Regions:
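Active-site loop-to-helix junction immediately N-terminal to the catalytic Tyr of the SDR YXXXK motif
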Residues: 2, 105, 151-159, 171, ...
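Canonical Rossmann dinucleotide-binding motif of NAD(H)/NADP(H)-dependent dehydrogenases/reductases
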Residues: 6-37
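C-terminal substrate-recognition "lid" of short-chain dehydrogenase/reductases
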Residues: 84, 137, 217-246, 251-252
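Substrate-binding pocket helix/loop in short-chain dehydrogenase/reductase
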Residues: 101-102, 106-114, 209
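Active-site helix of classical SDR
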Residues: 125, 161, 169
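Alpha-helical segment proximal to the catalytic Tyr-Lys
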Residues: 130, 174-178, 237
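Residue(s) in the substrate-gating loop at a strand-loop-helix junction
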Residues: 145
Length: 253
């Protein structure tokens, strides 16, 4: 049964790998046998992730990449293939958020969220997908959100970008699955990451959030690793075009 989840011999690119969910997924993949291409803008934190992965006796290539640049995305893919020989898994975890009422959202803020959460994610899929299509195999895991399923006030740009990610995932699955490339998404509920410390440490915000969350707590980043390993492994071989809810019951209401 353990072989179903084994990632030995696989090479995984993980974006947003310096901290939070991306960091935990990169390290989690390495513990199940994968070599990692860890991608982020924060080079200092990225080198810490590289060091931890190498303690698992796995290879780790740390790449500082601005995902707002398609040229840098393509360079990421080329470097990964040159250094690692192939790409088996792409986990698109990088993302941003702007907390603001819809009537106050600026064009720059809207574009910032859409450019990272949707545009750059698509071009990562395209760039790495070309390699996977030539190989005849690959797994792509996109980061959606429960807010993209049911919406959430004050998160207009974020929620709409994540809804688009789920539909993009379906569309890519329709195009690529018959060619050996499965494409799925994960939609977490509220996850307490460093980027959300300022929100979740606010008692008023946190207590209000708990009234909407059946499990009555936020997730730890490590709790998203298991679903990611499932989607990266043979355990999910017949699964494609799906968005896997890992939301503490958020969307059950």
């Amino acid at each position: 049964m353990d072989d179903l989840f084994a990632l030995q011999g696989k090479v995984a690119i993980v974006t947003g790998a310096a901290q939070g969910i991306g960091r935990e997924i990169a390290i989690g993949f390495s513990r199940y046998g994968a070599d990692i291409v860890a991608v982020d803008l924060n080079e200092e934190l990225l080198l810490g992730v590289k060091k931890e992965i190498e303690t698992e006796s796995r290879r780790c290539l740390a790449l500082k990449v601005d995902l707002g640049s398609i040229d840098q995305i393509n360079g990421m893919t080329e470097t990964a293939v040159q250094e690692m020989g192939r790409i088996d898994i792409l986990a698109n975890i990088a993302g941003v958020n702007v907390h603001k009422p819809a009537e106050d959202m600026t064009e720059q803020e809207w574009d910032f969220v859409q450019d990272i959460n949707l545009k750059s994610l698509f071009f990562c899929c395209q760039s790495v997908g070309r390699v996977m299509l030539k190989q005849g195999s690959g797994r792509i895991i996109n980061m959606s959100s429960s807010f993209g399923i049911v919406g959430f006030g004050g998160r207009t740009a974020y929620a709409s970008s994540k809804a688009a990610v789920s539909n993009l995932t379906k569309t890519l699955a329709i195009e690529w699955s018959a060619k050996g490339v499965n494409v799925n998404a994960i939609a977490p509920g509220p996850v307490w990451t460093p980027a959300r410390d300022h929100l979740f440490s606010n008692p008023e915000f946190y207590n209000n959030l708990m009234t909407k969350l059946p499990i009555k707590r936020t997730a730890k980043p490590a709790e998203i690793v298991g679903p990611a390993i499932f989607l990266a492994s043979e355990a999910s071989s017949f699964m494609t075009g799906a968005t896997l809810l890992v939301d503490g019951g958020w969307c059950a209401q």
